[in-house]
UniProtKB/Swiss-Prot annotation:
GO terms, molecular function: rRNA binding; structural constituent of ribosome
Subunit: Part of the 50S ribosomal subunit.
Record key words, sorted: Ribonucleoprotein, Ribosomal protein, RNA-binding, rRNA-binding
Family label: Belongs to the universal ribosomal protein uL4 family.
GO cellular component, one term: ribonucleoprotein complex
Protein name per UniProt: Large ribosomal subunit protein uL4
Domain of life the protein comes from: Bacteria
Function description: One of the primary rRNA binding proteins, this protein initially binds near the 5'-end of the 23S rRNA. It is important during the early stages of 50S assembly. It makes multiple contacts with different domains of the 23S rRNA in the assembled 50S subunit and ribosome. Forms part of the polypeptide exit tunnel.
Region (Disordered): 43-69
UniProt xrefs under InterPro entries: Ribosomal_uL4, Ribosomal_uL4-like, Ribosomal_uL4_dom_sf
Length: 201
């Protein structure tokens, strides 16, 4: 199959297996959820009765006071005591094998092409790290909510994009399922498309 180049005459020959597959909604959902779960910190924590400071001394003797027996002032039923079932840091990550991950990326790319949300250009960049320069270029192309993907990290392009809302710049190694579906349009250079095809094959 061929992808039309927006900034030049001609087209780019790409693999049907990578850019022309059917959209697998269940797979994409599973991979996106797993990716988001892996980004969770899971640092919630509370203290049990053994972890709360103090409470080493028995508050009163075992027998003879008429009161209920007590061994520590940090018992969960006491004010300032530890939690009965204290929350602990958790690992929320889910296992996704490489085949599933690559399949989801291919599925998303194919759907972006069908929805005409993937734009391929021969080259894309700015001469200097100026936001105004990049903003003007994107306005020319009628793009304001876009993920820009290049073959390698372009320092000027990255710095120019940092102050633009809804614009992100990644290299091929930096893309993920969440970023691909988060933007209205995805702008890719021809070099990036070929490298991505190589990585996914």
């Amino acid at each position: 199959m061929e992808l039309t180049l927006k900034d030049a005459k001609g087209a780019l020959e790409v693999s049907e297996a990578t850019f022309g597959r059917e959209f697998n909604e269940a797979l994409v959902h599973q991979v996106v959820v797993a990716y988001a779960a892996g980004a969770r910190q899971g640092t919630k924590a509370q203290k049990t009765r053994s972890e709360v400071a103090g409470g080493g001394k028995k508050p009163w003797r075992q027998k003879g006071t008429g009161r209920a027996r007590a061994g520590t002032i940090r018992s969960p039923i006491w004010r300032s005591g530890g939690a009965t079932f204290a929350a602990k840091p958790q690992n929320h990550s889910q296992k996704v094998n490489k085949k599933m991950y690559r399949g989801a990326i291919k599925s998303i790319l194919s759907e972006l092409i069908r929805q005409e949300r993937l734009i391929v250009v021969e080259k894309f960049g700015v001469d200097e790290p100026k936001t105004k320069q990049l903003a003007a270029k994107l306005k020319e192309m009628d793009l304001n909510d876009v993920l820009i993907v290049t073959k390698e990290v372009d320092e000027n392009l990255f710095l120019a994009s940092r102050n633009l809302h809804k614009v992100d710049v990644r290299d091929v190694q930096g893309i993920d399922p969440v970023s691909l579906i988060a933007f209205e349009k995805v702008l890719m250079t021809a070099d990036a498309v070929k490298q991505l095809e190589e990585v996914l094959s």
